[in-house]
Amino acid sequence: QAAVCDAGRAPEDCAERVLTLADGVFDKISEEKSPQGVICVAKDIDKCKKIATIYSEGKIPPARETVVLLESVRDPSNIGAIIRSAAAIGVDRLILSGDCADVYNAKAVRASMGTLFGQQIDRVGDLPGVIRQLRESGRRVFAAALDSGAERLGDFPVEVGDCVIIGNEGHGLSDAVLSAAD
């Protein structure tokens, strides 16, 4: 259902309800200090798909796609900024672990500056499993990690279809993800 604090009319092709709300009620359901006057409430989709489900739905990234994987990125503003940056550099798809922040959180949507709605984003329950499947399909998957023996991005050729994993803000990447990557 959608809530509109303006004219109280739904577009003619809208099948859902439109409600006019008192300012106090509107302020209670909005996370914004100065909302724009329109709020959409929608049912959330399945946030955590198993890799087998993604494969059966044909959503494994084609080899030509540039992919960024995120593990346990918890701050919604960081998720939004990563989505925005990924769009700016031509990333085709983002794959998020199930415990990443909600991409539809108001802070994530705002930080993405609208690019969220043009990006292909998948959320998976078994990120190491996805990484293994990507590697088995011939793709290289690089882990962005602070390690004295790590190679710097730019010190080696990046090819079409290569993938990069970015980890949690405080803890980086898990051992399971690091061991699954190249």
Predicted regions and their residues:
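RNA substrate-binding interface of SAM-dependent RNA methyltransferases
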Residues: Q1, C5, L19, G24, ...
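Short, conserved catalytic or adaptor-binding loops enriched in Gly and charged residues
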Residues: A10-D13, A111-T115, V177-L178
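Glycine/small-residue-rich loop that forms an oxyanion/phosphate-binding "nest" at active or ligand-binding sites
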Residues: A10-K43
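Structured helix-beta-strand junction loops
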Residues: C14-E16, S137-G138, A180
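Short connector loops at helix/strand junctions that flank enzyme active sites
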Residues: K33-P35, A63-E65, E159-V160
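Short, hinge-like loop/turn segments at secondary-structure boundaries
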Residues: V38, A111-T115, E159-D162
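Gly/Ser/Thr-rich helix-start
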Residues: V38, A81, T115, N168-L173
